Regions:
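Aromatic-Pro/Gly-enriched surface loop or interdomain linker
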Residues: 1-31, 150
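A conserved amphipathic helix/loop scaffold
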Residues: 28, 36-170
Length: 170
């Protein structure tokens, strides 16, 4: 569902994309990478994504990235495993949203559904927060400058009317 969400948004905006194998480690040919819900990944792959951004790449990552290794063993460190500095965030809580909207810093909003992480910004700039009485201090969408590149993090599954402008503006 997450891959389809992103692919449909790119398609509607007439943005071509390649599907890249999880065995790939050299992403230098790409202007930007979109990594949807990469729940299980080796440390080697996560390190390659970190290097890609550090060397000037632009990464769009979604919730649940780097949660487990390739054998599905859950990482017990701060999430997202090995990508916290690159993304400029961390989280240790997630929940199922019920009637929760996110609000961007420029006044747009969208309804969340199915998944939301309670993201804390370390070096990232929050682009959207949850419009919720108890979860409003957590970021839903962030952007981080990291060495020579940048990373956009989508910490929730939300409606398309916000996804497309975020992808295009990034």
């Amino acid at each position: 569902a997450v891959m389809r969400w992103l692919a449909d948004a790119l398609y509607r905006r007439n943005i071509e994309f390649d599907m890249v194998s999880s065995g790939e480690r050299d992403f230098s040919a790409y202007d930007f990478l979109v990594v949807p819900a990469l729940y299980a990944a080796s440390d080697d792959l996560l390190g390659a994504l970190d290097r890609y951004v550090a060397e000037g790449g632009h990464l769009i990552a979604t919730f649940r990235i780097g949660f487990a290794d390739e054998q599905l063993k859950i990482h017990h460190d701060v999430q997202p495993h090995l990508l916290g500095r690159c993304l400029g965030i961390h989280y240790d809580q997630f929940t199922y949203p019920k009637n929760v909207r996110i609000a961007t810093t420029d006044g747009r909003s969208a309804l969340t559904h199915d998944w939301m992480e309670l993201v804390t910004c370390d070096t990232a700039t929050p682009l959207a927060h949850y419009d919720h009485p108890f979860r409003g201090s957590y970021a839903a969408v962030t952007e981080n400058a990291y060495q020579k590149g940048s990373a956009l993090y989508l910490g929730a599954f939300f409606d398309d009317e916000l996804l497309e402008p975020l992808l295009v503006s990034y």
